[in-house]
Amino acid sequence: MKKLVQAMVLTGLVAVPAASIAADSPHKLSANVTLTSDYVFRGISQTGGDPAIQGGLDYSHASGFYLGTWASNVGWLEDFQGYTKGNMEIDVYAGFRGDIGKAGLIFDVGAIQYMYPGDHPSNITKADTSEVYAALGWNWFTVKYSYYVSDEVFGFANADGSDYLAVSASVPVGETGLTLGASWGTFSFDNNSAQDYDDWKVSAAFDMGKVGKVFDGVTVGVAYTDTDANPNNWTETAPNTKFLGDSTTTVYLTKAF
């Protein structure tokens, strides 16, 4: 509960409407807040099956440039990595997206820094991670490749050169407000191949604005995720015994501003 309260304080900073910007301005600000039953990232639970409160703030320009920040409570720093204190993830990212010709293709390139403030013994590898990415989208489909440029990758040392490839689809069901999704990804850890795994997900999300204007910006969803990760390498340390790559079903509610 303490971790959730801390996350609520932080994400509450972005849970207010952005400053007024003229409708025809090239500058756009947006924010979002999410409550989820489990924070699952690329198939791996970041909260050990516990709930998370998350929030983000984004700026975009008509040219295609964007930047933003996002935060969530996490549990794996203490329960898996060996941190003596640490229960937050804070991300900062920037990139550029745009159209390719008239074929309906959309590209997105950028970089993201994952930061995990906290205390850890000197023999524990820091969790902070630097990633660059490139994505190509067409209609309902997206292919995204992420490459890690930091020496440490989510707590694994000497792992620069690790990468993650994902293929996903997001299909709206007519004008119902329902969107069905599916994805598959594969994570390869340089010099840490025992940690390699594939993950997959199926999901459904519903735009509550279809129910009434009072719910504009609210989305509810459910997702099922699973991996082929080795439990010997992805299970929390004693006294916790949660396999972080286990199959799980999550539900969430998001409010966008």
Predicted regions and their residues:
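Cleavable N-terminal export/targeting peptides
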Residues: 1-28
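Short loop/turn motifs that connect adjacent beta-strands in outer-membrane beta-barrel proteins
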Residues: 21-28, 64-67, 99-106, 171-180, ...
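Short glycine/proline- and aromatic-enriched beta-strand/turn motifs that initiate or cap beta-hairpins
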Residues: 23-75
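Residues that define the transmembrane beta-barrel architecture of outer-membrane proteins
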Residues: 27, 49-53, 86-90, 105, ...
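Membrane-embedded beta-strand positions of outer-membrane beta-barrel proteins
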Residues: 31-33, 57, 67-69, 94, ...
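Transmembrane beta-strands of outer-membrane beta-barrel pores
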Residues: 35-41, 61, 71-75, 98, ...
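Surface-exposed loop and membrane-interface regions of Gram-negative outer-membrane beta-barrel proteins
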Residues: 45, 62-126
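Outer-membrane beta-barrel "beta-signal"
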Residues: 202, 206-208, 241-257
